[in-house]
From Swiss-Prot:
Cell compartments where the protein resides: Secreted
Role of this protein: Inhibitor of lipoprotein binding to the low density lipoprotein (LDL) receptor, LDL receptor-related protein, and very low density lipoprotein (VLDL) receptor. Associates with high density lipoproteins (HDL) and the triacylglycerol-rich lipoproteins in the plasma and makes up about 10% of the protein of the VLDL and 2% of that of HDL. Appears to interfere directly with fatty acid uptake and is also the major plasma inhibitor of cholesteryl ester transfer protein (CETP). Binds free fatty acids and reduces their intracellular esterification.
Alphabetical keyword list: Lipid transport, Secreted, Signal, Transport, VLDL
InterPro entries: ApoC-1_sf, ApoC-I
Family, similarity comment: Belongs to the apolipoprotein C1 family.
Signal peptide: 1-26
Swiss-Prot/TrEMBL GO biological process terms: lipid transport; lipoprotein metabolic process; negative regulation of cholesterol transport; negative regulation of lipid catabolic process; negative regulation of very-low-density lipoprotein particle clearance; triglyceride metabolic process; very-low-density lipoprotein particle clearance
Organism per entry: Eonycteris spelaea (Lesser dawn bat)
GO cellular component term of the entry, any: very-low-density lipoprotein particle
Gene Ontology MF annotations: fatty acid binding; phospholipase inhibitor activity
Residue stretches in coiled coil: none
Protein's name according to its UniProt entry: Apolipoprotein C-I
Metal-binding among keywords: no
Amino acid sequence: MRLILSLPVLAVVLAMVLEGPAPAQAAPDISSAWESIPEKLEEFGRTVKEKVRTAIDHIKKSDFPEKTRKWFSEMFDTLKEKF
């Protein structure tokens, strides 16, 4: 039963592989790929910059730093008392 089902699937896969890539899927020209790298790097830098700036603003607006300092000072005080 499995062999009967797997043979048509194998035939379809083999036909797709032998057909080759579609024109839209063809590899782009290497020179155009090299030309687009600086643009992509600039875009990546801008998005990283925006995300980091947003994260820093979020941390500044939250009460997380204050709670963290308070927790560390409490833990330090309890350690002092134990020793």
